[in-house]
Curated annotation (Swiss-Prot):
<feature type="compositionally biased region" description="Low complexity">
    <location>
        <begin position="326"/>
        <end position="336"/>
    </location>
</feature>
<keyword id="KW-0963">Cytoplasm</keyword>
<comment type="function">
    <text>May be involved in a process influencing telomere capping.</text>
</comment>
<dbReference type="GO" id="GO:0006979">
    <property type="term" value="P:response to oxidative stress"/>
</dbReference>
<feature type="region of interest" description="Disordered">
    <location>
        <begin position="406"/>
        <end position="431"/>
    </location>
</feature>
<protein>
    <recommendedName>
        <fullName>Restriction of telomere capping protein 5</fullName>
    </recommendedName>
</protein>
<feature type="compositionally biased region" description="Basic and acidic residues">
    <location>
        <begin position="307"/>
        <end position="318"/>
    </location>
</feature>
<dbReference type="InterPro" id="IPR006571">
    <property type="entry name" value="TLDc_dom"/>
</dbReference>
<feature type="domain" description="TLDc">
    <location>
        <begin position="342"/>
        <end position="574"/>
    </location>
</feature>
<dbReference type="Pfam" id="PF07534">
    <property type="entry name" value="TLD"/>
</dbReference>
<comment type="similarity">
    <text>Belongs to the RTC5 family.</text>
</comment>
<feature type="region of interest" description="Disordered">
    <location>
        <begin position="307"/>
        <end position="336"/>
    </location>
</feature>
<dbReference type="GO" id="GO:0005634">
    <property type="term" value="C:nucleus"/>
</dbReference>
<dbReference type="GO" id="GO:0005737">
    <property type="term" value="C:cytoplasm"/>
</dbReference>
Amino acid sequence: MGQDHSVEARPPPTHEEVVRHLAGKFADKCYTPLEIYSLKDNFKSLADTVQDVKYLKEDTVARFLEIPDALRVTPVLFQSVSFLAAFPFLRDAPAVLGLEQLVIAITILTGRWKRVLKSPADRTKLLFKSLAVYDRKLSCATLTPVASPMAAEAKGASAGFAVDEAGDDDEAEDDGDDDLVLAAFESLDCVDAFRHGDAPPKIQGAMIPADNFVRLIMLLLLVAPLDPQERLSQYSDRLVGTELEDLHATAQCVVQAFLDVEEVPGLTWSRFRKILPVCCPFMFDAGFNALFSHFLFSKNIDFNKRKPTGSEEDRGEQPKLPQKATPSQSTLPQPLLPQAGSILNANILSQLSFFIPGDSLFRCLRLLYSGDEDGFSMGSFESKVFNWRAPTLLLVRGRRLDDHPDGTRESAFAASIPPRRFPNGGGGGTTENSDEIITFGAFIAQPWRHTHRECFGDDSSVLFQLGPVHDVFRASTMNRDYAGFVKPTGSGSSNHHGGIMFGCPAPSPSKASSATGALVALGSVSLFLDSSFEFGVFTHDHTSRGGAYAGSTSRPRNFQERFAVNCLEVWGCGGDEESKRQAERWAWEAREAEARRKINLGTGDLEADRALLEMAGLVGQNRSGGSMI
């Protein structure tokens, strides 16, 4: 006792040791041996070598992933990859893309880091930093690619993107320590390195340039339906002519949710983190996961190769290692949609997958109703949609109306709803731009039914706008007026103009007026289509509370859109089983209708026959025995 024992302090690990340890941990915990073998094989075949250092160049990564030149997104994507490859030492970004750095970047981009890093944080902040530049003069900002390991080494340990000194930027908030980076150091038992100077750079002053963000959204729309073993080149038909123009237009609608490209040069962190979880929570998930999983499938290994015989082994022939088979270049992918719609196409489908899980959309939709084909009537809508027992997706597109009604029918619609109080929602130009095409929709998980005193739907319902501004209105818990289908009634205590409504209260006999001029009650955040499917109105009363749908995160203001309906369609979400059930119900109803037509009362007395049918509830009381058109 009393004798001092000198304990030699262990020196802190170097950056290289930390990166090697983290990459090894990711490889062991996040991948199968087969996937790591394929990743190493792909890296070996793709890497360039400078002074015994193997690394991947920008054009090599783009060529392997088949990134289209038409999108001009390769520099943006490689900036993100090389930044994430520097994890957890983000101050050293951009990193040379060696094997260990590639493992780290792919682990983050595919979301597999969750198997190792136990942190409540997500990768949102990392993704923003990987796409942002720190130059206030964004018009002059350029991305500086890493040409080689020697060039990166010459730039010093603090090499990366140009960073200005902190100034009086609007983005003055201190984002604090990055939880994901801290979790990485904790998993390696070297938290002191994080606390003593290796913390990631601050977000203050960072922006994603608007042009870069548009190109990135175009890529994400393209890769959204991609399967890990599908070739991106299989979707090349979406990159020519009008298809490319439509892809760009769809991307512009999504970008409008984050920023007005005519007003601001780039996207800030505060705006990014505010909008992304509400309007585009799945934007980076499915597409990036599948795209960067391509590195985990090697083309040099054939899973279908037979095991060599003993004579082959005697001749020294090496067997091929088993691997998941990569798809043949001649294999045609299953179409994303079984048929084209008037509104829904591949780009709109990808846009929907940004906030509705893609598993419910891609190769799972069936066109139930189309106004162009089935007629714009509630009777036709009911006969086509009500038998679908799975979730449905309603889309409506129309032309924005002027403030002053034009014609008797438009005037009648304006007289059926409360007077306009709010300006237009804006989007594709000035807020007063009439004749602009606008698109709304709703996702309803419950089957459709008639609405008498209670609406249908649940808290998974979503109301949304797709153009000219992408916006999402999540279900609220304040009330349950999620969806309604009300046929018009011209008299009585339950008088209602009728129509399809989302976020509007159900008809209430105690409050309804018997006068034919009663107004439709519009919810604070609501979409209403009149009974003729000729006009519609979307209302966003930001000052009110208690609606069935939450207000806009992107546009916290009052606005209203009145429009003339051009297209209306409903898609059923589900597979062959749901289609089979619907077909069976249609067949049963057809048999019942045929049986009703063949009823032979045999009395010869028309008045007595009619009285008997009225007692059965088949005619009379505003019933005609068929659908009301």
